[in-house]
Each structure stands twice: as C-alpha cells, then as structure tokens.
C-alpha cells in the first residue's frame, strides 16, 4: 500500500458536478507526481468547492494533507488529515498522514495513537510498524531525559539561592547550566513546571548582576515562542516589574531585559508555537490585551524620572520593533494608531529633551535619533490622510503647548521637538516649522549667548535646510548668520554645526555640476575644515559626528570626493568613528561612502532629450568630469586600501535602531560598488564582506536587498562559495540569489543570479535541495526560453547542475511536458556554450533515468542529426557529451541501439574509438562493445 501520495478512490456512481471535481482531483494527482505541490493543492481546493460527496471530500482533504506535508506546513497537514478522518474514521492514509504531521510538531503522544490505529487496521503494513517503533523510541528517550532533568533543575536552584555559595565557581556554573537547559523546549517546560518562574523571581530580587542575567536569560528560553508560558510568566513577575528592569543602570542587565521583552512580544503577537499547540489550553487569555499592557508600560517608562539613558534607548528600540506592521500587505495597523493616541506625546518628550537642562530626562547621544526613527516608522505605518492629519494635529498641539506660555525653556523644547520631527517624519517637521513664530525664534536663538540655546537653534536650522524650498529661504536669510557663527564663535561645538549648515546649503545642487550655491572653491574649503575636525581626537565623538554630516553633503562635489579619498587620516578617523558608541553617525558615513563610490542610481540622459531641453532653454544637469568611471574606480581602490570593508562590516553588526532600512540600503549600494571589479572581490571577501552582505540581503528596503543580493551573486560567481560563505552560511545565500530571478529585476541581475546558482548547485545535494525549496526551478525554466542568449545559456547551465537532484529528474521524466525536447533542441544550437550546457544536462539525465532515452527519438525528428553533430564537433567537451548520450541510449534499449547503428553514428564512433586515449575514445569504444554484445555488429578478426 502507498501512503505518501494522493490516493485513488473506489469506483462510484456519478452525480451532478462530480465529473469536474473528478477532473480536478486527477489534475491535482498529476501535479503532485510532478512535484508541483502548490499547484496540486490549488486543484484539490477547487475540487472541494464544487460540492463533492462526503467520500470525495475525505479523499481531497487527505490529498491536501499530503501536499502540506511536502510543503513542510505541518499544522495545516494535521488539520486537513483531521477533516478527512471526521468524514471517514477508518481512512488509514489520513491517519498515517496526521501521525506524520504530529510527529513533526513534537506531539509524539498523539502521533502514537494514530499509528496504533493504523496498525490495527492494517496489521501487516511494515511502514506503519516501523514508524510506530521509531516514535516509541523517541518517547522513551524523552521520558529518560525529563526524569534526569528533574533532579538537575532542583539542584541548580538550590545552589543559586544558597547564600553560602555567594560568588563561587559552583554558583556560576549552575547559572550557566540553567540557561543552557532553558534553550531546549523540554528543559524550558521542565523549569516552568518546577515552579521555576517564582524561583527566578527570587534571583531577580537579589540585585546581583550575575544572578539577574542568569534569570533573565533563562526566562528567555521559557517564553521563547510559547504564548501560555509567556502569559504565566508576566502574571507571576508582573509586566511592570519586567519592564522596570530595562531602566537599571547596568547595561548588560538592561540589554538582557530588552531581549526578554522582545521574546515575550513575539510570543504574544505571533501566537502559539506549533510544537506546543496541544498544551496551550492551560491558560486562556486575550493576547491583544496583554500586548497593549506591555506596550503601555514601555511608553510609561519613556518619561519616568530615574530611568537610565540606556534603558530609555532600549524601550525605544523595542517599540520600533514591536509596533509598526512588518509588511504593508498586513491591513491591520490598529496597534500603531493606539500607540499614537496613547503615547505620541511621551515619544515627543524624549525627542524634544534638551541635554544638560534642569529637570530634563536622562538620555544618551542616540536617544533623540531613536525617537525620530520611531516617529518615522509610526508615520509611515499610517494608511490614509485622516490618520496622517491626526498625527500632524497631535504633534502641532504638543509643540504649541511648549512654545506658547512656557518661556524660553519651553521654546527650546519646542524647537528641539521640531528638529526631532525633521529627522524622522519630515512632513510633520515642515508643517511644525510653519507654525507662527517658530522659524523666527530659530533665527533669533542662533545669535544667543548661551551655548545650549545656540546648539538647539543651529541644529534646527540645519535640519530645516533639507528641503529645497527651505534651503533657498535660508540661503537668502540665514547664510550670513551661519557664516558669522562659524567665524566668530569661540566654541567648536557651535562652529562645527554652523559649518554643517553651510555644507548642506552648499550641496543643494546635488551632483549637478552646473548648479553651485557658493563661489568656486568654497566647498573645498568647507570640506577641508570638516576633515580637520574629524581628525581631531580632542573633540568628543558627538561633535565630530557633525563633521561627518558636513562631508556627507559636500561629497556630492567630485572635487571634494577626490580630496577626501586622498586623505588617509580622514578616512581612518571616519572608519574609527563608525565603530564608536556614537551610532547616529552611521547614516552620514553611509551617505559619504555612497557619494564617493557614485553608487547612487544614475541614468544617462537621452541625447535627443538633452538637445530638446537646451532648445527649450530648460536646465540640464551636467556630470562632473571627475565622476567618470575611471575616477570612480580609482576612488574605490583607495577606499578598499584604507579598510572600508572592515568598517562597514562593523556597521552592519550594529544592533541599534539607528541602523535603519535606509542606512542598510546605503551600505548595500557601497558593497555593490566595491565588488564591481573582479580583482577587488578577493579583498572584500578577505575582510568579511561576504558575511556582512547576508543580513543586508535579507532585511531592509527592496532596493537595498536587491543591491546586496547582486553583490552576493558577484562574489559567488568569481570566488569559491565554500570559502566565501563557510559552514551553514552558504545555505543562507540561496534565498537572496533566487530573489534576483524575479521579473522586476534587471537582465544583468537575472544573469548573475543564474550564474551564482549554477555554482552553488554544483557543490552539494543539500544546496540543490535548498534551491528547490526556494521554488527557483520554475523561474529558471522560464529563463531557458529567454531571447537574450547569455541569460538563456546561464539558465540552461543551472538546470544542468540541478538535474543531479532526484526531484528535477522526476520533472523531466513526467509525461506531458517539453523539458526533454528543449534540451535536445538546444544541443543542436549554434551557440557552442549553450550546446555544451544542454548536452551535459542530457548526458546526466539519460544516465540517471534510462527511461528518458526511449523518449529522445519521440521529441523531435532531428534527434539523430543533433547527436551526429555533437559527435563530429571539433570541441572535445561536446564530443564527450555526445558519446555519453549515445552510450546511455544504447544501454537502455536494443531497439534504439539498432537505429543508431544503422545510421552514420556507427562510422563516426568507429573513427572516434581509434583516437588517442581520452574520455571520448573510451565512451565510443564502450558504444561499439555494446553493439557487439547486442550482435548488431561483428568484432574485427583481430579482436578490435
């Protein structure tokens, strides 16, 4: 009996609608046999919708279960099998499939019950008996593990809570063992059921750093992906208590609490872990309510006095990760709307905090930037004008409340809040700038004698210059003021900010060589001063960040780029600053590097359109002579020599909300520029570029992920993938490469992805399975029909390597498709490289699947001519592939061998067999020996 694929029903009388349902079921069966499990699933679903009989419904449900098993969606497989069993309790196939799904879900006790039922229904079925023995062994092993774990858990808690063991090595080892045990599902469950949460609460109450870290990390294991345990833990510890740990001064403890809260949030939002679904009924709660309680406490923490700056940053980081939707396809943004209504003012309070002012919140250098990012994420998550208008109204009301009637301190906070908005949701910031008196106060405070007031005002002026309309206003009204501050102020902190304002205004023309805001040479002088401050170690990192901001704007000018890459000291200072705790510098560093490598999107204008624009007296942007490819390549080499890859690798590893998706995109663009030249790729790999590109290709903006994936493809093509991506990392490369096969990507990206996948497919069966799992085969097949010869060739080469997999061989062997015909026809094309790939695939397939040999004469009448052309080719590789195909065909059938020997193939093989010793002569000789064996030809008298 077969239990792995869709079943065949017993004959039954037909009824209305049954014929179409029957056709769909048969279609689904064929698709299943071909490996198209999603297509089969669709066919079975359509058949169910046609109102089939209960018997048919049971068959269709169990067939859907088989599809879900193949697609590794075990929860749905269990559900479908259960529906089949409800219709027919004696459906042994459905019972077996449900047991397979339950086993994968870890619910072994339930899987055993189904298997016992299967054995009782079919006692002689060896498949059922073997499966029952395997699961029985797994259950016994789990029981032994759990019983031995009981004593270990009790012993570890005794050591940790014993006051006599304070600071001993024994206590440290016990805490480490507890954390390790909690990482396993069974261990976490054991700790939880052994009153572990209450005991861990006692560890938290000790106040000792080591014990608190051990407790928090153990709680991470207990709560990870398990909703009921998470709710129980929050109930015992109290949500307020857990959140309050974020605010402690110790950074390690605060980070551990941040990780725990992230895990708790994931468990609440994503729901139940599949492996423990059967045990979730212990606690019935509303996850949405628990979620809001958790977020509400985080919002309260933002404005609490006594909370550490690091704790406030961690709370903002959690809100950034928790609240906005992961994808715009998700229609529900209610959590974002709730946070805006309940907590927007609290977020603005952090963003508007004025450092060193009396009564202000404790913040770090990154706090206000994190608040800006959170505000930006919330604003971007809004779906309609009404929601955005509400956001604007709340922001404006908050700013007015401080600006009007709160004196100078209130005006400073209002202006600081506007700066925060300008760095985040700039639309809201620009609207706030238009409020009565705000811009005038900014200009007036720039001339204040108090450093704090000047800092706030100048920063607001810099951020306000971001829009062209605002920049032109400030150029007309504020440039003189900024110049006076730059030249006249005695404080470096003021001078450097004024300089950045001038830099920003000076770069308003972007890369357009013909648009210059300042006189010739002024931008070079500004850049020189920025580099001077950047290299000054005596200035704190927060102030030096502004020098990088200035360079990020000035490097639009190619002259500035050339001088910057020549200044080794400035480059080293830039890279060193990017590794510092001053995380808010990351975007500016990325912008400067994008400008230096010209890795922004640029399209050559149509010459005819340029002439038309000139005739119409319209402005036409001009490219700087030093932005030509030869200059760009030289700059890239200088950056590589200065260690840019190592610096960028450190930036990618940054766990901070400041590393936004936009920042990731900048880094992806730079990496792509760095690997453009083949000779530079070894340097990038040696400095860790391959490892850094993986997270960039998996997370970020669509453009950023595509750029990073293309850089990965370039590295995979020219470097040994096993050296570039050692260990398990090589399997992570597949998904980004497959993403480049989508039609939205350019032809070059498609081509490079195909070449990279070809290399990976030739390494191991596990990699080929990973490519198949990512559903790349249909896309690769599509590109085999591409008009562009290089893409068509690359797709064929990739398919040739994938043909080593059983699943791909099944696709070629399936009836009703032209896959084999395409390879045969391509083996006769004029493109020699395409012929080599197609003939190689044909040789492999006929070797692995002899049944395909008999189908070659059926796919085209020109098959014999194509084989003869391969045998007569001057290229030894094509000759070898041709002789192997002929040998495989002769070994598969005497009839085919007879047809071949009656043609000119015999004469060609005879000539080839007499050549010098080579794979071709050996294969040709084997063909002739097979013909002799079949008695189709006679051996020579001398035995040759």
Curated annotation (Swiss-Prot):
Q: Which InterPro entries match?
A: ARM-like, ARM-type_fold, TPR-like_helical_dom_sf, TPR_rpt, UCS_central_dom
From the UniProt entry, list the residue stretches annotated as the region Disordered: 1-25
Q: Which GO terms describe its cellular component?
A: cytoplasm; nucleus; perinuclear region of cytoplasm
Q: What is its main location?
A: cytoplasm
Q: Which domain of life is it from?
A: Eukaryota
| Keyword line | Acetylation, Chaperone, Cytoplasm, Developmental protein, Differentiation, Myogenesis, Nucleus, Repeat, TPR repeat
Molecular function terms, GO-annotated:
Hsp90 protein binding
An individual GO BP term:
muscle organ development
Which residues does this entry mark as bearing N6-acetyllysine? 70, 483
Q: Where in the cell is it found?
A: Cytoplasm; Cytoplasm, Perinuclear region; Nucleus
Q: Where are the TPR repeats?
A: 21-54, 58-91, 92-125
UniProt subunit comment: Interacts with PGR isoforms A and B as well as with NR3C1 in the absence of ligand, and with HSP90AB1. Binding to HSP90AB1 involves 2 UNC45A monomers per HSP90AB1 dimer.
What job does this protein perform? May act as co-chaperone for HSP90 (Potential). Prevents the stimulation of HSP90AB1 ATPase activity by AHSA1. Positive factor in promoting PGR function in the cell. May be necessary for proper folding of myosin (Potential). Necessary for normal cell proliferation. Necessary for normal myotube formation and myosin accumulation during muscle cell development. May play a role in erythropoiesis in stroma cells in the spleen.
Q: What is this protein called?
A: Protein unc-45 homolog A
């Amino acid at each position: 009996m077969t239990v792995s694929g869709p079943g065949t029903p017993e004959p039954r009388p037909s009824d209305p609608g049954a014929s179409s349902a029957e056709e769909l079921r048969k279609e689904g069966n064929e698709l299943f046999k071909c490996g198209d499990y999603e297509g089969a699933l669709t066919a079975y679903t359509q058949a169910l919708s046609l109102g089939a009989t209960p018997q048919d419904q049971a068959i269709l449900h169990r067939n859907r279960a088989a599809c879900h098993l193949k697609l590794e969606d075990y929860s749905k497989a269990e559900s479908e099998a259960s529906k089949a069993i409800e219709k027919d309790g004696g459906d042994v196939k459905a019972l077996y499939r449900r047991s397979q799904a339950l086993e994968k879900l870890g619910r072994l006790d339930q899987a055993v019950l189904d298997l016992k039922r299967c054995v009782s229904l079919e006692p002689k079925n060896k498949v059922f008996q073997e499966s029952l023995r395997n699961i029985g062994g797994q259950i016994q092993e789990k029981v032994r593990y759990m019983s031995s774990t009981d004593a270990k858990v009790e012993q570890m808690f005794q050591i940790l809570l014993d006051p006599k063991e304070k600071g001993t090595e024994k206590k440290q080892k016990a805490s480490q063992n507890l954390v390790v045990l909690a990482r396993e599902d069974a261990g976490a469950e054991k700790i939880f059921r052994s009153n572990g949460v209450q005991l861990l609460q006692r560890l938290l109450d000790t106040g000792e750093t080591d014990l608190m870290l051990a407790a928090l990390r153990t709680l991470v294991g207990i709560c990870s992906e398990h909703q009921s345990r998470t709710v129980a833990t929050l109930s015992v510890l109290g949500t307020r208590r857990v959140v309050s740990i974020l605010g402690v001064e110790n950074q390690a403890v605060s980070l551990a609490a941040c990780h725990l809260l992230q895990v708790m949030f994931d468990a609440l939002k994503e729901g139940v872990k599949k492996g423990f679904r059967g045990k979730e009924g212990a606690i019935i709660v509303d996850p949405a309510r628990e979620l809001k309680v958790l977020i509400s406490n985080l919002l309260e923490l933002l404005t609490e006095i006594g909370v550490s700056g690091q704790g406030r940053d961690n709370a903002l980081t959690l809100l950034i990760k928790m609240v906005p939707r992961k994808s715009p396809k998700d229609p529900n943004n209610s959590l974002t709307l709730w946070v805006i209504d309940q907590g927007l003012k609290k977020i603005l309070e952090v963003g508007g905090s004025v450092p060193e002012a009396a009564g202000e919140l404790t913040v770090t250098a990154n706090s206000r930037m994190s608040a800006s990012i959170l505000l930006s994420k919330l604003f971007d998550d809004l779906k309609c004008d009404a929601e955005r208008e509400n956001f604007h109204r709340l922001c404006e009301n908050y700013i007015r409340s401080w600006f009007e009637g709160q004196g100078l301190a209130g005006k400073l906070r209002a202006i600081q809040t506007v700066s925060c908005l300008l760095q985040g949701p700039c639309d809201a910031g620009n609207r706030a700038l238009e409020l009565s008196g705000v811009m005038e106060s900014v200009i007036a405070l720039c001339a204040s004698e108090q450093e704090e007031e000047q800092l706030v005002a100048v920063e607001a002026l810099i951020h306000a210059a971001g829009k062209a309309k605002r920049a032109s206003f400030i150029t007309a009204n504020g440039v003189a003021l900024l110049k006076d501050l730059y030249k006249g102020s005695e404080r470096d902190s003021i001078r450097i900010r004024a300089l950045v304002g001038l830099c920003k205004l000076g770069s308003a023309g972007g890369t357009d060589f013909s648009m210059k805001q300042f006189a010739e040479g002024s931008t070079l002088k500004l850049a020189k001063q920025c580099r001077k401050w950047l290299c000054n170690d005596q200035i704190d990192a927060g102030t030096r960040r502004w020098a990088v901001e200035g360079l990020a704007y000035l490097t639009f000018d190619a002259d500035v780029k050339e001088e910057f890459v020549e200044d080794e000291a400035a480059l080293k200072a830039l890279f060193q600053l990017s590794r510092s705790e001053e995380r808010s510098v990351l975007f500016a560093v990325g912008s400067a590097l994008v400008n230096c490598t010209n890795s922004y999107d640029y399209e050559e204008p149509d010459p005819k359109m340029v002439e038309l624009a000139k005739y119409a007296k319209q402005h036409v942007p001009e490219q700087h002579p030093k932005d030509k490819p030869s200059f760009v390549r030289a700059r890239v080499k200088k950056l590589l020599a200065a260690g840019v890859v190592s610096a960028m690798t450190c930036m990618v590893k940054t766990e901070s909300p400041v590393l936004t998706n936009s920042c990731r995109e900048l880094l992806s663009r730079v990496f792509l520029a760095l690997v453009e030249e083949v000779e530079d790729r070894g340097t990038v790999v040696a400095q860790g570029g391959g490892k850094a590109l993986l997270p960039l290709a998996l997370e970020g903006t669509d453009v950023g992920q595509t750029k990073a994936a293309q850089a990965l493809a370039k590295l995979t093509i020219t470097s040994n993938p096993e050296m570039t991506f050692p260990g398990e990392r090589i399997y992570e490369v597949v998904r980004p490469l497959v993403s480049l096969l989508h039609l939205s990507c350019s032809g070059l990206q498609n081509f490079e992805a195909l070449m990279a996948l070809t290399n990976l497919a030739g390494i191991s069966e596990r990699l080929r399975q990973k490519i198949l799992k990512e559903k790349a085969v249909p896309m690769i097949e599509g590109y085999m029909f591409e008009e562009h010869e290089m893409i068509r060739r690359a797709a064929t080469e990739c398919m040739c390597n994938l043909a080593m997999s059983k699943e791909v061989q099944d696709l070629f062997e399936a009836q009703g498709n032209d896959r084999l015909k395409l390879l045969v026809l391509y083996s006769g094309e004029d493109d020699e490289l395409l012929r080599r790939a197609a003939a190689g695939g044909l040789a492999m397939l006929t070797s692995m699947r002899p049944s395909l040999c008999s189908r070659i004469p059926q796919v085209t009448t020109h098959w014999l001519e194509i084989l003869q052309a391969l045998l007569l080719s001057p290229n030894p590789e094509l000759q070898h592939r041709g002789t192997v195909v002929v040998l495989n065909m002769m070994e598969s059938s005497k009839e085919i061998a007879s047809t071949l020997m009656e043609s000119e193939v015999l004469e060609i093989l005879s000539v080839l067999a007499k050549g010098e010793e080579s794979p071709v002569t050996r294969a040709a000789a084997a063909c002739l020996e097979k013909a002799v064996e079949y008695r189709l030809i006679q051996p020579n008298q001398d035995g040759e």
